[in-house]
């Protein structure tokens, strides 16, 4: 962006420097969902001829702008409100993505742009030439905001405080412009004064220190005054207002927690742990928490579970739990720890540009991982790393790669570093949400690779150095260059690494930062007895999408009879075969213990081994020091030894996965041994349950004895005297609790020779439910009971229909009747005694959908639609919507698809709207290569309109709509559309115009919006309309002139008049009102309604 290689300092893209901002919201109306207030920005011009100031502001109605108390004219133009002209017949995604990327760049603060352009009054020009301070005062209001601020107003009786009404800021990446005018960039830091006037019964929580709370004379309202003296980006400013209950942390008085009424006991328990997280981070970073206070606010209808802002974090209220809940506790603690890690890197230390985002996400994810290792142990940490690695590998192979450090400009290729994607990665607001999630995942994994290279000690020293520099800078009064120490850049971070460690990590950076893709290894081996050598063959696939070629060191661990040996191979360009000398001679007769990797010595039964080979098992890249997928071939007995005796949980998980392909009595025995071993990591034992079920099904004809796991379960959890009755619940040992609730779910997957669930298993599960007794247990059994319902659902197999008879409740299969009765009983009980997070209702809804899909009960979406309505708990709604999405796909129901699309547009909860798009993308009703009755012109238009103008208030939602459009129709024009008339196409990649019958002019999108300095020539007092501007440029193509920006420039003025002439023809809905004569124009701001007024997005019209 603004950073050339080797460039040290930060150069602002703006011709001024912001030093302080005041935000004052003096009226909040919960009834109307409106906000009124003003902002005041203190700026220092950095160039002499500053006559235009660009700021960010979306959906705010701007009433008046004054600079140093003089009225200033301003223009509001937001091309992202409607990306492509509504008249346009374009329907191909390539065109949209280019236009959208251009629209976002046109208002991108990191390119010095903004939606609001203010003209500096001529009286101040001399003042500006002397680079003296300017104070910009903007009065604004927000009416029923669709993004940025979220109002939750329960429709019950009582005052707003009694109803628990609250409002909070939210959004994806830099979204502060949605609720007040600002420079919405992570690189523009300033100090803040924040004031909020609310009803006396409400509490306003914001960033920084609460300086004072002042009541009005009538005591009906009060104003909260916050000061944030640490320079902070507007994007890290937040707000939450509601009738919160307040808890000062008993261990750390500078920490305060807020929750909605009646939840204080849960808040006390949930946050009782947070001081330990503080202590951990301060200790490893050898640096104090950077702010003077920290606030946690738990709110309803959260945008994301955790949102970190300067000195405060906003959490979902669903994370709160009591001491009786087991499963939620680690999840909530992880959320708290993530939020705190981001306080240091993300809020306190910000980024220079979007291409440096990976550093912040990487460091915060990495130190969060260290916290996890300390809190949950090394096994859990390794399991998490493996899980994250599998996720990123699967995503990159599916989509073609995630690029951590996209550098723009320069060479042709670099301009579009992600041509395999259907969206631009040049800007956070054009990214698919899933891509961004995977981006964060890859960032922390790469940080771990850097740690492997330079050591943890050096890594923490680098972080400490970054924090110390930032800390020194933050305490300085405003000096133009000091605060840039609080911004991290890729260059600065890498330089710091080489200074501290003295190591060259350039190859690693080149491999994982500057290119996308993961590595795919295929390994096999042969033992050469004569030479006593292991001949290892390692192949790579670097031609498939999402892969890259790896050259460098690769660790291989070989467990032999005499111990475990590590070898480092050098993977060269073409080398495939590697000879590794063996240390042990092949097996001797004398009985001897075998030393393992961790120094332990164990007795093994070696009868399964090959007589002339000393090899027990082999592992490639055991430390996961390459982002890779490994497919390794070794004999079944080697996997069995590895599962039993290798102490690394990742190796055990990998062997379990491999053993699915070897359904033999020996595999069965190895898995059963693991299930019985109490020292074994609980997640490995849980995986073993499911693997054992798969193996049992493959061996069904030769299986002897009771169904898999049944006797084991009986021995562990049932009464000695009466084996079919389960003991009273006692969940004191969490390991056995997780095993107890997983085993029945896995057993329900067992099938007999006729591919039905054995009657014995079903009876066993029904007995577990019937005799479940939680009276003496100090923990809740809601998750356990929910898993029992999942087990019932797993036992269901497809219905066999006789003479196409219609299924009714009278002719139900007797087993299915039992299952349905249990589900109904559970659902009714839930209405009387709801479980924590309604886990049981969620499982029941999923089970009913399974019965429908298997043809046991009539397929119908109405039950799910009633549960999906606003007002139900969010987990229930998501489960119900999942079922409706599935029904839409299976039954090809246009009606339900319309119902879902309607919900995406009208549902009050942003998270639910996002989830519906997400579920439709993951389980689409049809895809681009399918013929489907659902695919028609009306649907194309509807989705096009949704992403073009219907989601302008929420970046995440718009990118979700783009993902869905891509899944359904692909990149080019949807196949179900009629062929358009002959048209001229400008092929951007080839840079030539061609005639094409299938596509309407795909004009030079890059030229639609321009952010270059030449724009200053535009007459500010003529209303500047982006849509007209674009349509004019499209018309230019019909003329013989070469499409180049310079050629377009002279037409600026002329296009306004041309547009007026054409207005009737186009039926535009723009209204331009010039209230004042030309004399007054300079002084008075003109009234003007935004280009997109009257369209589907409520746009901020500007008036006096």
Curated annotation (Swiss-Prot):
Cell compartment(s), UniProt: Nucleus
Superkingdom of the organism of origin: Eukaryota
Chain positions found as Phosphoserine: 1090, 1093, 1099, 1101, 1103
Any Gene Ontology biological process: RNA polymerase II preinitiation complex assembly
Keyword Transcription regulation: yes
Keywords attached to this entry: Nucleus, Phosphoprotein, Transcription, Transcription regulation
Keyword Acetylation: no
Main location, first listed in the record: nucleus
PANTHER family, alphabetized: TRANSCRIPTION INITIATION FACTOR TFIID, TRANSCRIPTION INITIATION FACTOR TFIID SUBUNIT 2
Protein family: Belongs to the TAF2 family.
Subunit composition and interactions: Component of the TFIID basal transcription factor complex, composed of TATA-box-binding protein TBP, and a number of TBP-associated factors (TAFs), including TAF1, TAF2, TAF3, TAF4, TAF5, TAF6, TAF7, TAF8, TAF9, TAF10, TAF11, TAF12 and TAF13. Interacts with TAF2C1. Component of the TFTC-HAT complex.
Designated name of the protein: Transcription initiation factor TFIID subunit 2
Species this chain originates from: Mus musculus (Mouse)
